[in-house]
């Protein structure tokens, strides 16, 4: 998978400092970066950075993403963390602890197709 454009735009030290500051200021929130998968025909999201409540489920967060990209109900959306489709009932806090990046952010990619084929 291509390197996140957020990672390309911001050096590691700056991302680490920002994530640490966010976690300190908002201990019950998770810093998440959401980006569209390459070659996906789904709309672009208007903002990449989210402060997500730790007790939100993946399914609830998918709903937030759907709203942000104004995706119609009949269109599918898949959210991946490190090319894996996380369970919709999983807590964002658990996904964060398991998959957070070295910079302290959780990176999620969304697509209109199940591009990676792993459940």
Curated annotation (Swiss-Prot):
Keywords: Autophagy, Cytoplasm, Cytoplasmic vesicle, Cytoskeleton, Lipoprotein, Membrane, Ubl conjugation pathway, Vacuole. Changing residue 117 to A: Loss of localization to autophagosome. InterPro entries: Atg8-like (IPR004241), Ubiquitin-like_domsf (IPR029071). Pfam families: ATG8 (PF02991). CDD domains: Ubl_ATG8. GO terms for molecular function: phosphatidylethanolamine binding. The record marks 117-118 as: Cleavage. The keyword Amino-acid biosynthesis does not apply. One of its GO terms (biological process) is mitophagy. It is a lipid-anchor. The keyword Lipoprotein applies. GO terms for cellular component: autophagosome membrane; cytoplasmic vesicle; cytoskeleton; plant-type vacuole membrane. Interacts with ATG4. Interacts with the Phytophtora infestans effector PexRD54. Interacts with JOKA2. This is Autophagy-related protein 8C-like.
């Amino acid at each position: 998978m291509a390197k996140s454009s957020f990672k390309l735009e911001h050096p590691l030290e700056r991302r680490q400092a920002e994530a640490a500051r966010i976690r300190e200021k908002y201990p019950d929130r998770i810093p998440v970066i959401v980006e569209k998968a390459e070659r996906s025909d789904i709309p672009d999201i208007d903002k990449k950075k989210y402060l997500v409540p730790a007790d939100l489920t993946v399914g609830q967060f998918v709903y937030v993403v759907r709203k942000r990209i104004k995706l119609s109900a009949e269109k599918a959306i898949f959210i991946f963390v490190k090319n894996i489709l996380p369970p919709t009932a999983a807590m964002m806090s658990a996904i964060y602890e398991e998959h957070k990046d070295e910079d302290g952010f959780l990176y999620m990619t969304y697509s209109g197709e199940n591009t990676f084929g792993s459940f």
